[in-house]
UniProtKB/Swiss-Prot annotation:
GO CC, one annotated term: acetate CoA-transferase complex
Matching HAMAP family: AcetylCoA_CT_beta (MF_01395)
Biological role: Component of the acetyl coenzyme A carboxylase (ACC) complex. Biotin carboxylase (BC) catalyzes the carboxylation of biotin on its carrier protein (BCCP) and then the CO(2) group is transferred by the transcarboxylase to acetyl-CoA to form malonyl-CoA.
GO biological process, one term: malonyl-CoA biosynthetic process
UniProt catalytic activity: N(6)-carboxybiotinyl-L-lysyl-[protein] + acetyl-CoA = N(6)-biotinyl-L-lysyl-[protein] + malonyl-CoA
Name assigned to this protein: Acetyl-coenzyme A carboxylase carboxyl transferase subunit beta
Amino acid sequence: MSWIEKILPKAKTTQKSSIPEGVWSKCSSCNAVLYKAELERQISVCPKCDHHMRISARKRIDSFLDHDNRMELGEEFEAQDILKFKDSKRYKDRLSAAQKNTGEKDALVVMKGELHGMPVVVAAFEFAFLGGSMASVVGARFVKGVEYCLEHNLPFICFSASGGARMQEALFSLMQMAKTSAALAKMSEKGLPYVSVLTDPTMGGVSASLAMLGDINVAEPKALIGFAGPRVIEQTVREKLPEGFQRSEFLLEKGAIDMIIDRREMKITLARMLGKFMGQTSVVS
Protein backbone atom coordinates (compact mmCIF):
# COMPACT_ATOMS: atom_id res chain seq x y z
CA MET A 1 0.00 0.00 0.00
CA SER A 2 1.35 3.45 -0.95
CA TRP A 3 1.64 6.35 1.57
CA ILE A 4 -1.17 8.26 -0.14
CA GLU A 5 -3.53 5.30 0.31
CA LYS A 6 -2.70 5.19 4.04
CA ILE A 7 -3.54 8.85 4.78
CA LEU A 8 -6.63 9.14 2.56
CA PRO A 9 -9.87 7.62 3.82
CA LYS A 10 -11.39 4.95 1.67
CA ALA A 11 -14.06 6.60 -0.43
CA LYS A 12 -17.29 4.76 -0.99
CA THR A 13 -19.86 5.82 -3.53
CA THR A 14 -23.42 5.99 -2.24
CA GLN A 15 -24.94 5.56 -5.69
CA LYS A 16 -24.36 2.94 -8.32
CA SER A 17 -23.05 4.02 -11.69
CA SER A 18 -25.88 4.95 -14.03
CA ILE A 19 -23.81 4.11 -17.11
CA PRO A 20 -24.96 0.75 -18.50
CA GLU A 21 -22.58 -1.72 -20.11
CA GLY A 22 -22.06 -1.51 -23.85
CA VAL A 23 -22.38 2.28 -24.05
CA TRP A 24 -18.73 2.93 -24.87
CA SER A 25 -16.32 1.43 -27.37
CA LYS A 26 -12.60 1.86 -28.03
CA CYS A 27 -10.94 2.55 -31.36
CA SER A 28 -8.43 -0.19 -32.16
CA SER A 29 -6.23 2.31 -33.99
CA CYS A 30 -6.06 5.54 -31.93
CA ASN A 31 -7.44 4.09 -28.65
CA ALA A 32 -10.04 6.87 -28.43
CA VAL A 33 -13.02 6.06 -26.21
CA LEU A 34 -16.13 6.43 -28.35
CA TYR A 35 -19.85 6.61 -27.70
CA LYS A 36 -21.14 3.38 -29.21
CA ALA A 37 -24.32 4.91 -30.65
CA GLU A 38 -22.24 7.54 -32.45
CA LEU A 39 -19.87 4.86 -33.72
CA GLU A 40 -22.83 2.94 -35.16
CA ARG A 41 -24.05 6.11 -36.88
CA GLN A 42 -20.59 6.39 -38.42
CA ILE A 43 -20.85 2.75 -39.66
CA SER A 44 -17.97 1.73 -37.36
CA VAL A 45 -15.60 4.41 -38.66
CA CYS A 46 -13.73 6.19 -35.87
CA PRO A 47 -14.76 9.88 -35.86
CA LYS A 48 -11.38 10.78 -34.33
CA CYS A 49 -8.92 9.10 -36.72
CA ASP A 50 -11.18 7.74 -39.53
CA HIS A 51 -10.05 4.17 -38.86
CA HIS A 52 -12.38 1.72 -40.61
CA MET A 53 -13.20 -1.06 -38.18
CA ARG A 54 -14.35 -4.46 -39.39
CA ILE A 55 -18.11 -4.95 -39.51
CA SER A 56 -20.39 -7.91 -40.16
CA ALA A 57 -21.82 -8.71 -43.57
CA ARG A 58 -25.38 -7.85 -42.55
CA LYS A 59 -24.40 -4.54 -40.93
CA ARG A 60 -22.61 -3.63 -44.13
CA ILE A 61 -25.61 -4.53 -46.28
CA ASP A 62 -28.00 -2.72 -43.91
CA SER A 63 -25.92 0.46 -44.16
CA PHE A 64 -25.65 0.21 -47.95
CA LEU A 65 -29.08 -0.81 -49.27
CA ASP A 66 -32.38 1.00 -48.89
CA HIS A 67 -34.52 -0.56 -46.16
CA ASP A 68 -37.40 -1.70 -48.38
CA ASN A 69 -37.77 -4.37 -51.08
CA ARG A 70 -35.01 -6.71 -49.93
CA MET A 71 -34.74 -10.39 -50.77
CA GLU A 72 -31.93 -12.73 -49.72
CA LEU A 73 -30.55 -15.00 -52.43
CA GLY A 74 -28.96 -18.42 -51.98
CA GLU A 75 -29.87 -18.88 -48.34
CA GLU A 76 -30.95 -22.44 -49.14
CA PHE A 77 -27.30 -23.45 -49.67
CA GLU A 78 -25.67 -25.04 -46.62
CA ALA A 79 -22.11 -26.28 -46.08
CA GLN A 80 -21.43 -30.03 -46.25
CA ASP A 81 -18.40 -31.83 -44.85
CA ILE A 82 -17.92 -33.87 -48.03
CA LEU A 83 -14.28 -34.77 -47.30
CA LYS A 84 -14.87 -35.58 -43.61
CA PHE A 85 -11.93 -33.24 -42.99
CA LYS A 86 -10.20 -33.10 -39.63
CA ASP A 87 -7.17 -31.12 -38.47
CA SER A 88 -6.96 -30.18 -34.80
CA LYS A 89 -10.77 -30.14 -34.90
CA ARG A 90 -13.37 -31.67 -37.19
CA TYR A 91 -14.55 -29.38 -40.00
CA LYS A 92 -18.12 -30.19 -38.99
CA ASP A 93 -17.42 -28.83 -35.51
CA ARG A 94 -15.75 -25.70 -36.89
CA LEU A 95 -18.82 -25.03 -39.03
CA SER A 96 -21.16 -25.47 -36.07
CA ALA A 97 -19.10 -23.09 -33.92
CA ALA A 98 -18.92 -20.45 -36.67
CA GLN A 99 -22.65 -20.69 -37.30
CA LYS A 100 -23.37 -20.29 -33.60
CA ASN A 101 -20.99 -17.33 -33.18
CA THR A 102 -22.13 -15.38 -36.26
CA GLY A 103 -25.71 -16.46 -36.81
CA GLU A 104 -24.83 -17.15 -40.45
CA LYS A 105 -24.87 -20.46 -42.34
CA ASP A 106 -21.71 -19.56 -44.25
CA ALA A 107 -19.30 -16.75 -45.09
CA LEU A 108 -21.25 -14.88 -47.79
CA VAL A 109 -24.58 -13.05 -47.69
CA VAL A 110 -26.23 -12.11 -51.00
CA MET A 111 -29.14 -9.68 -51.10
CA LYS A 112 -31.32 -8.22 -53.83
CA GLY A 113 -32.41 -4.72 -52.92
CA GLU A 114 -32.41 -1.08 -53.95
CA LEU A 115 -29.69 1.55 -53.89
CA HIS A 116 -31.34 4.98 -53.80
CA GLY A 117 -34.30 3.36 -55.57
CA MET A 118 -32.20 1.56 -58.20
CA PRO A 119 -32.50 -2.28 -58.15
CA VAL A 120 -29.16 -3.97 -57.43
CA VAL A 121 -27.73 -7.21 -56.04
CA VAL A 122 -25.15 -6.99 -53.24
CA ALA A 123 -22.87 -9.68 -51.82
CA ALA A 124 -20.90 -9.24 -48.59
CA PHE A 125 -18.36 -11.54 -46.95
CA GLU A 126 -18.67 -12.36 -43.25
CA PHE A 127 -15.06 -12.35 -42.03
CA ALA A 128 -16.05 -13.65 -38.59
CA PHE A 129 -17.18 -16.90 -40.25
CA LEU A 130 -13.93 -18.89 -40.58
CA GLY A 131 -12.06 -15.82 -41.79
CA GLY A 132 -14.52 -15.17 -44.62
CA SER A 133 -12.98 -18.13 -46.41
CA MET A 134 -14.20 -19.09 -49.86
CA ALA A 135 -15.94 -22.46 -49.92
CA SER A 136 -18.59 -24.31 -51.93
CA VAL A 137 -21.52 -22.40 -50.41
CA VAL A 138 -19.76 -19.06 -50.92
CA GLY A 139 -19.25 -19.86 -54.60
CA ALA A 140 -22.82 -21.11 -55.02
CA ARG A 141 -24.32 -18.01 -53.42
CA PHE A 142 -22.10 -15.69 -55.43
CA VAL A 143 -23.11 -17.38 -58.69
CA LYS A 144 -26.77 -17.26 -57.62
CA GLY A 145 -26.43 -13.49 -57.25
CA VAL A 146 -24.79 -13.17 -60.66
CA GLU A 147 -27.48 -15.31 -62.31
CA TYR A 148 -30.19 -13.10 -60.78
CA CYS A 149 -28.44 -10.05 -62.25
CA LEU A 150 -28.24 -11.69 -65.67
CA GLU A 151 -31.93 -12.58 -65.58
CA HIS A 152 -33.13 -9.15 -64.45
CA ASN A 153 -30.41 -6.91 -65.99
CA LEU A 154 -29.09 -5.60 -62.67
CA PRO A 155 -25.67 -4.39 -61.51
CA PHE A 156 -23.75 -6.49 -58.98
CA ILE A 157 -21.68 -5.19 -56.05
CA CYS A 158 -19.47 -7.40 -53.88
CA PHE A 159 -17.83 -6.39 -50.58
CA SER A 160 -14.87 -8.71 -50.02
CA ALA A 161 -13.40 -9.50 -46.60
CA SER A 162 -11.61 -12.82 -46.69
CA GLY A 163 -8.45 -14.69 -45.79
CA GLY A 164 -8.71 -16.77 -48.96
CA ALA A 165 -9.76 -20.32 -49.83
CA ARG A 166 -11.09 -22.62 -47.10
CA MET A 167 -8.48 -25.34 -46.63
CA GLN A 168 -11.00 -27.77 -45.10
CA GLU A 169 -12.70 -28.07 -48.49
CA ALA A 170 -9.46 -28.47 -50.47
CA LEU A 171 -10.10 -28.54 -54.26
CA PHE A 172 -13.82 -27.91 -53.77
CA SER A 173 -12.79 -24.54 -52.36
CA LEU A 174 -10.20 -23.75 -55.04
CA MET A 175 -12.74 -24.60 -57.74
CA GLN A 176 -14.83 -21.62 -56.61
CA MET A 177 -12.17 -19.26 -57.97
CA ALA A 178 -12.84 -20.52 -61.50
CA LYS A 179 -16.58 -20.86 -60.91
CA THR A 180 -17.06 -17.26 -59.77
CA SER A 181 -14.73 -15.91 -62.46
CA ALA A 182 -16.69 -17.73 -65.18
CA ALA A 183 -19.95 -16.29 -63.84
CA LEU A 184 -18.50 -12.77 -63.90
CA ALA A 185 -17.40 -13.30 -67.51
CA LYS A 186 -21.10 -13.71 -68.38
CA MET A 187 -21.83 -10.39 -66.65
CA SER A 188 -19.18 -8.76 -68.82
CA GLU A 189 -20.54 -10.36 -72.00
CA LYS A 190 -23.99 -8.96 -71.26
CA GLY A 191 -22.60 -5.51 -70.46
CA LEU A 192 -23.79 -5.45 -66.85
CA PRO A 193 -21.56 -3.61 -64.36
CA TYR A 194 -19.79 -5.42 -61.54
CA VAL A 195 -18.27 -3.26 -58.80
CA SER A 196 -15.82 -4.94 -56.44
CA VAL A 197 -15.26 -3.29 -53.05
CA LEU A 198 -12.16 -4.55 -51.26
CA THR A 199 -12.29 -4.20 -47.49
CA ASP A 200 -9.89 -5.17 -44.73
CA PRO A 201 -8.66 -7.83 -45.28
CA THR A 202 -8.99 -9.21 -48.83
CA MET A 203 -6.39 -11.93 -49.30
CA GLY A 204 -5.58 -15.26 -50.93
CA GLY A 205 -7.87 -16.91 -53.45
CA VAL A 206 -10.55 -14.23 -53.12
CA SER A 207 -8.10 -11.48 -54.08
CA ALA A 208 -6.85 -13.69 -56.93
CA SER A 209 -10.32 -14.12 -58.40
CA LEU A 210 -13.63 -12.31 -57.88
CA ALA A 211 -12.25 -9.41 -55.81
CA MET A 212 -10.02 -8.06 -58.60
CA LEU A 213 -12.37 -8.68 -61.54
CA GLY A 214 -14.60 -5.66 -61.13
CA ASP A 215 -15.32 -3.24 -63.95
CA ILE A 216 -14.45 -0.82 -61.16
CA ASN A 217 -12.31 -2.00 -58.23
CA VAL A 218 -12.61 0.24 -55.18
CA ALA A 219 -11.31 -0.17 -51.64
CA GLU A 220 -11.83 1.20 -48.17
CA PRO A 221 -8.98 3.25 -46.65
CA LYS A 222 -5.98 1.29 -45.33
CA ALA A 223 -7.49 -2.09 -46.25
CA LEU A 224 -5.01 -4.99 -46.40
CA ILE A 225 -5.16 -6.43 -49.93
CA GLY A 226 -2.94 -9.10 -51.42
CA PHE A 227 -2.33 -12.80 -51.99
CA ALA A 228 0.19 -13.90 -49.36
CA GLY A 229 0.45 -11.90 -46.14
CA PRO A 230 3.28 -9.40 -45.60
CA ARG A 231 4.99 -11.52 -42.93
CA VAL A 232 5.06 -14.53 -45.25
CA ILE A 233 6.55 -12.43 -48.04
CA GLU A 234 9.21 -10.94 -45.77
CA GLN A 235 10.23 -14.39 -44.56
CA THR A 236 10.41 -15.63 -48.16
CA VAL A 237 12.37 -12.78 -49.77
CA ARG A 238 14.24 -11.93 -46.53
CA GLU A 239 13.81 -8.23 -47.12
CA LYS A 240 11.87 -5.48 -45.37
CA LEU A 241 8.77 -4.53 -47.33
CA PRO A 242 8.02 -0.88 -48.22
CA GLU A 243 5.95 1.21 -45.83
CA GLY A 244 2.24 0.61 -46.36
CA PHE A 245 2.86 -2.38 -48.63
CA GLN A 246 -0.41 -4.18 -49.55
CA ARG A 247 -2.53 -1.37 -48.15
CA SER A 248 -5.18 0.18 -50.40
CA GLU A 249 -3.30 3.49 -50.70
CA PHE A 250 -0.21 1.62 -51.96
CA LEU A 251 -2.30 -0.32 -54.49
CA LEU A 252 -3.99 2.86 -55.72
CA GLU A 253 -0.60 4.50 -56.23
CA LYS A 254 0.57 1.48 -58.27
CA GLY A 255 -2.63 1.34 -60.34
CA ALA A 256 -3.94 -1.96 -58.95
CA ILE A 257 -7.27 -0.43 -57.86
CA ASP A 258 -9.32 2.44 -59.25
CA MET A 259 -10.29 4.46 -56.20
CA ILE A 260 -10.54 4.56 -52.41
CA ILE A 261 -13.90 5.45 -50.87
CA ASP A 262 -14.68 6.23 -47.25
CA ARG A 263 -17.31 3.79 -45.94
CA ARG A 264 -19.59 6.68 -45.00
CA GLU A 265 -19.55 7.87 -48.62
CA MET A 266 -19.79 4.41 -50.21
CA LYS A 267 -23.55 4.35 -50.74
CA ILE A 268 -23.89 7.75 -52.41
CA THR A 269 -20.70 7.34 -54.49
CA LEU A 270 -21.59 3.91 -55.89
CA ALA A 271 -25.20 4.99 -56.47
CA ARG A 272 -24.01 7.84 -58.68
CA MET A 273 -21.52 5.59 -60.44
CA LEU A 274 -24.00 2.79 -61.14
CA GLY A 275 -26.68 5.30 -62.11
CA LYS A 276 -24.43 6.47 -64.94
CA PHE A 277 -23.52 2.92 -65.94
CA MET A 278 -27.20 1.88 -66.07
CA GLY A 279 -28.37 5.08 -67.75
CA GLN A 280 -30.31 6.16 -64.67
CA THR A 281 -28.68 9.52 -63.97
CA SER A 282 -31.71 10.64 -61.96
CA VAL A 283 -30.99 8.05 -59.22
CA VAL A 284 -28.98 10.58 -57.18
CA SER A 285 -29.01 14.27 -58.04
